[in-house]
Amino acid sequence: MRTLMLTGGLLMLAGCAGLPDPDPTQAWIDLETHQDTALQALEVDDKTSTDKRYFEVPPGSHELVVRYQFPVEPTNIGGPATEPLWRDCQLSVKFKDFNAGQRYQLQAGNIGFRPWAKLYDQQRKVVGQGQPAGCQRT
């Protein structure tokens, strides 16, 4: 019985696993999320991302596609709305010079209905900007 409880507990913990260790031969891109928003890794170079929490890419040029979900406050909507309107958007970020062993950070936000994304290097220098690739209401 104890073995069964221990095994069940370990299986539950495995589902809550943290991020893997970065591969030093790849570039690692962290996704920075904010309260009440969601940012997910979708694609790298038209291939589905294996993990929605980060990107890991070989050195060189790549196009990253992310999904960004965010609320638009009623004050930005106008009219009788009292609840936020949720937007579900995709953004594309291209960068030509990912380097092995380097960590990057992709940050997203919005101004009213318009989403934005920026890619930062380790020195917090902006090295890429996101381009909207479509939005819808949720």
What do the predicted segments below correspond to?
Residues 16-138:
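Short loop/turn and low-complexity linker motifs enriched in small/turn-promoting residues
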